[in-house]
C-alpha cells in the first residue's frame, strides 16, 4: 500500500492554505491563496463565501498536483478556520443569501449594545463564557435575518442554514449531505451552552433564531462524513478533525495540560490557556471557551482576543506605505533610534480583551519633530507585545496560575525583534514553534487521531517541537515604565472615542 497523507485545510481571515502532512508531521506541500476583503461601510468587514470555497478548491488541487499525491492517498482531511465569521445560505440551492460577516466586523454593534442595555450580559456570560460583543456569530445571524426581506420567515420554515466557515466547508465538500460544526466553533457563536454542550434555547428565543438553522455539534476528533467525489477530484476522503483556528493552534502546540499557554500572532493575536476539565469564569473580561473535546472529555480554556496584530503590519505596508513587505519591519525596528517613546494603539476595529471597546479607534502618541518612519514601525510592532501583556496579566489574575513560558506561533512570530521585546515586556521566556503553521498541524493531529493514523498523544510529541527561545533581558523598572506608557495611551484612546473618562 502506498504511503498515506493528511490534508489540512486552514481557512484564515485573509487567505486559505492547504497543507499536506506525512506521518512524521512534515509538510509535503503547502499552498496559499488570498481572497478579497470587502469593506462596504466603515467598520464593516465581509467575505464572499463562494470565493472562500473557490480558494479551497484551487489550493487543494494545486497542493495535490505539486506533491503528485492522489486523492486516494489521503487518509483523512482536517479543517481549521477563522472563527465567528457567519454564513447563512439557502438549504436547497446552497447559495449564501448575504456575504459572510467577518469576526472583525462591527456592523452588528447596535444589536450587541441593546443586549447589554437590556441586562443580558450576566446570563449570556454564565451560559456561553463570552462577553456580549459584535465579534460573535449570534448578533451577525440576527443582523442578516433583520436586514434581508423575508429571511426571518424563511429561517422559521427551515429554508435557511447557518454555519461558521468550518460548517460551510463541510457542507460544500460533502455536497450538502452534512451540516455539522465542532464544539470549539460552536462555543464562539454566543449561542452555545459550554456547560451542557448544547445550543441554548433561552438565548435562541431571546434572539429569535430558529434552532433548525443550526448545525449538529460534534467533538473535535471524529469522522463527520466524507467528500463527495464530484466536489473532491473523484475521491471519497473522510473528514475527521475540526477546530477553530486558535484551538487548533493550542492543540498543534500540544498545550494539553492545564496552565499551558500559546499565543498566535496572525491577523489578530490570540492568547489561549488550557484550564483543564473545569471552566474558569473570568472576572476580568477574558473569554471562557472550549479548548477541545476528544471523545467524551472536554478541555476548557481562557482566551484573550486581540483584534489587530499582524494586520497592523499590513496597514504599515498597504495603507501608509512605510514597508514594502512585512518582514522588513524587523530591520526597521532595530534601526529605530527612539527610546521607545512612541506608542501606536492599533484599535482600527475597536479594542478586544480585556477592554472590549468596539468604539475605540487607532491612535499614535509621543511623536516629536525627530520621529521617523522606523520609530513608527517599531512602535507598531511593539503594540502586538503590549496587547499580549494586557491579556497575559489578566489571565494570570483570573486563573491564579503563574505563566512561566509563552509558546508562540503564527506569521508574525518570525519576527525576532518582536519576540525579544515580548520576552522583555513580560519578563518571561518565549518559545517559538519549530513549525509556525500550528493551526494546520493541530487540524491534522485531530483528524489523524480520529482515524488511527496516529495512535495517541504520545505519538505526536516527537512532531510538535519547539524552535528558538527568547529570554528576557530588560530591567524590571524599564519594563514597568514602558507598560505604564502603554496603559496611558490606551486610556487616552478610549477617552477620545467616548468623550468621557474611564
UniProtKB/Swiss-Prot annotation:
Pfam families in the cross-refs: FGGY_C, FGGY_N
The reaction(s) this protein catalyses: glycerol + ATP = sn-glycerol 3-phosphate + ADP + H(+)
One Gene Ontology CC term in the entry: cytosol
Annotated binding of ADP, by residue: 13, 17, 267, 310, 411, 415
Gene Ontology biological-process annotations: glycerol catabolic process; glycerol metabolic process; glycerol-3-phosphate metabolic process
Residues forming coiled coils: none
InterPro entries recorded: ATPase_NBD, Carb_kinase_FGGY, Carb_kinase_FGGY_CS, FGGY_C, FGGY_N, Glycerol_kin
Function: Key enzyme in the regulation of glycerol uptake and metabolism. Catalyzes the phosphorylation of glycerol to yield sn-glycerol 3-phosphate.
Subunit relationships: Homotetramer and homodimer (in equilibrium).
Protein name listed in UniProt: Glycerol kinase
Species lineage: Bacteria, Bacillati, Bacillota, Bacilli, Lactobacillales
Gene giving rise to this polypeptide: glpK
Amino acid at each position: 500500500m502506498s504511503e498515506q497523507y493528511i490534508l489540512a485545510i486552514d481557512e484564515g481571515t485573509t487567505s486559505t492554505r492547504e497543507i499536506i502532512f506525512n506521518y512524521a508531521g512534515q509538510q509535503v506541500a503547502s499552498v496559499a491563496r488570498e481572497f478579497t476583503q470587502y469593506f462596504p461601510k466603515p467598520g464593516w468587514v465581509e467575505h464572499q463565501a463562494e470565493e472562500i470555497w473557490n480558494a479551497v478548491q484551487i489550493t487543494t488541487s494545486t497542493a495535490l498536483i505539486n506533491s503528485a499525491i492522489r486523492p486516494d492517498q489521503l487518509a483523512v482531511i482536517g479543517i481549521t478556520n477563522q472563527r465567528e465569521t457567519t454564513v447563512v445560505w439557502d438549504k436547497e440551492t446552497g447559495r449564501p443569501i448575504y456575504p459572510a460577516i467577518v469576526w472583525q466586523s462591527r456592523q452588528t454593534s447596535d444589536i450587541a449594545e441593546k443586549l447589554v442595555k437590556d441586562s443580558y450580559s450576566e446570563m449570556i456570560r454564565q451560559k456561553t463564557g463570552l462577553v456580549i460583543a459584535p465579534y460573535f456569530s449570534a448578533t451577525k445571524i440576527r443582523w442578516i435575518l433583520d436586514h434581508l426581506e423575508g429571511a426571518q420567515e424563511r429561517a422559521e420554515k427551515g429554508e435557511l442554514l447557518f454555519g461558521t466557515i468550518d460548517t460551510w466547508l463541510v457542507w460544500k465538500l460533502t455536497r450538502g449531505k452534512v451540516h455539522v460544526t465542532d464544539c470549539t466553533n460552536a462555543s464562539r457563536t454566543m449561542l452555545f451552552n459550554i456547560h451542557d454542550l448544547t445550543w441554548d434555547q433561552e438565548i435562541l428565543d431571546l434572539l429569535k433564531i430558529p434552532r433548525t438553522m443550526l448545525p449538529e455539534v460534534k467533538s473535535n476528533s471524529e469522522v463527520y462524513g466524507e467528500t463527495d467525489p464530484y466536489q473532491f477530484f473523484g475521491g471519497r476522503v473522510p473528514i475527521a478533525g475540526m477546530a477553530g483556528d486558535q484551538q487548533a493552534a493550542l492543540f498543534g502546540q500540544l498545550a494539553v495540560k492545564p496552565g499551558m499557554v500559546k499565543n498566535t500572532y496572525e491577523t489578530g493575536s490570540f492568547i489561549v490557556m488550557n484550564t483543564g476539565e473545569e471552566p474558569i469564569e473570568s472576572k476580568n473580561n477574558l473569554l471562557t471557551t472550549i479548548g477541545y473535546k476528544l471523545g467524551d472529555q472536554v478541555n476548557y480554556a481562557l482566551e484573550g482576543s486581540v483584534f489587530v496584530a499582524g494586520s497592523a503590519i499590513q496597514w504599515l505596508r498597504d495603507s501608509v506605505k512605510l514597508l514594502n513587505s512585512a518582514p522588513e519591519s524587523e530591520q526597521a525596528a532595530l534601526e529605530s533610534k527612539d527610546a521607545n517613546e512612541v506608542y501606536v494603539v492599533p484599535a482600527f476595529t475597536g479594542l478586544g480583551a480585556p477592554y472590549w471597546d468596539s468604539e475605540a479607534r487607532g491612535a499614535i502618541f509621543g511623536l516629536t519633530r525627530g520621529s521617523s518612519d522606523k520609530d513608527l514601525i517599531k512602535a507598531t510592532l511593539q503594540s502586538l507585545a503590549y496587547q499580549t501583556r494586557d491579556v497575559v496579566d489578566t489571565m494570570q489574575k483570573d486563573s491564579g496560575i503563574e505563566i512561566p513560558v509563552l509558546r508562540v506561533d503564527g506569521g508574525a512570530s518570525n519576527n525576532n525583534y518582536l519576540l525579544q521585546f515580548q520576552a522583555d515586556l513580560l519578563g518571561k521566556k518565549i518559545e517559538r514553534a519549530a513549525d509556525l503553521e500550528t493551526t494546520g498541524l493541530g487540524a491534522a493531529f485531530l483528524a489523524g487521531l480520529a482515524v488511527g493514523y496516529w495512535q495517541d498523544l504520545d505519538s505526536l510529541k516527537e512532531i510538535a517541537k519547539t524552535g528558538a527561545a527568547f529570554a528576557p533581558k530588560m530591567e524590571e523598572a524599564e519594563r514597568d515604565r514602558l507598560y505604564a506608557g502603554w496603559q496611558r495611551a490606551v486610556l487616552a484612546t478610549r477617552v477620545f472615542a467616548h468623550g468621557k473618562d474611564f
